[in-house]
Amino acid sequence: AMKANKVRVVRGEAKVKGRSQNGIEIECAGETFYAVNLLLCTGSEAFVPPIPGVKEAGDIIVTNREILDLKEQPKSLVIIGGGVIGMEFASFFNSLGTEVTVVEMLPKILGGLDGEISAMLQDIYAKKGIKFNLNCKVTEIRGNEVVYVDKDGQTLSAKGDKILMSVGRRAVTAGIGHENLGLELNRGAVKVDDKMRTNVPN
């Protein structure tokens, strides 16, 4: 469909080099392209916080991307984060028979939802066997063990064949060359106005 509409797709890592007399200069896959207008669509990626032990845990730690590529169903799964994505996977793996434990920093799951709805859903999930540890802050990962502190200051832990990091997402802006155009960022994301325009014309 793209080709039929005279749209060329170039696969590779694109980087903005700056402005020239030919327009905005972009390099990708060994080629240089020029544009009058530039649309940034770099998307977002799962945020993995720098919790001690994360790197050492290796492929025990997964995000919403890697968990879909698993070759074997985990017998147990610890999910760090009780937001929408975390609860989707909690429900899915619970229905397959995986033992699921959710560790959430807030006092409720699905933080953006109405409190009554959140409580109702938590009750439904709990009756299906999902374990919840709310008001808990993760302090360390020890292999397949998630160490956390509860609201009373007690240190506890939960083990899983896999640990799903589901604490949010962040904009992909590293390496795109935004600094070469002077694009302003806001907490790592490209800053835009109410019409999705950046501080740089075009």
Task: Annotate the PLM regions.
Residues 43, 97, 127-129, 182, ...:
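Short glycine-rich hinge loops at helix-strand junctions in the catalytic core
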Residues 11, 35, 58, 73-76, ...:
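Phosphate-coordination loops involved in phosphoryl transfer and adenosine-cofactor binding
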